[in-house]
């Protein structure tokens, strides 16, 4: 019962995805991983989960409400910290700060992390052997540690690559590519450009040379945009969400893209962007676009990068 309550409560924080607006396409970007993922919200999140789960599960298993609250709170507490280990950004200190914490040690989706952990928990529950759950916890800690080592190695490779080009980065980040911690995407910023590359860290190190794009300058790139318009405000909201890593799409000139994410680590092709319209009214919002039609070809290329072929 304790494990089930903790598991369900641990998933509850992501219910913030239902916070959306039919008139403001960017609203969900502000609220996903916001107050429900804040450290200060954890006790209240545990209470809310316990109010539901105690009467559905806890009471039937002979638990007091206090016990249900404790197990729900412990489960709920794991969610935000695990999310902060990913690359998306989590507002741990809301409402005191709107900083999005992203420790970049693991991909948002990584079966090599999730499946062994889930298997250990399920077997521990079915076989009534808590030691298996401890093995799962140990695996999670070890894997996160490996991700940290890999991130540091990827950043070192990124700085070395920048030095070879004669660049002194203003900032540089390394993020794991999709579903693994072997191949990483490095993004570094110079005075006027961003540079994106893929690197295979530690195991048979290798650089997958990428591309570069100019930083967004609204006066130059979109001179028609009214600074007082809602679209201009939406650009700044998207800049905050993207930690400043935004550029005009070189193919679609009215799109502003988040260059941090792509299906292949050495590409700039974004997974999402916002689209502005010159003819839009003053109060019209920018449109949010997703671009995830990579197909099997890109998946096979990523697999070759991971396996070192």
Predicted regions and their residues:
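N-terminal membrane-targeting hydrophobic helices
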Residues: 1-156, 160-176
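Extracytosolic and intramembrane catalytic regions of membrane-associated proteins
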Residues: 170, 183-309
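Short, surface-exposed binding/anchoring microloops in extracellular/periplasmic proteins
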Residues: 180
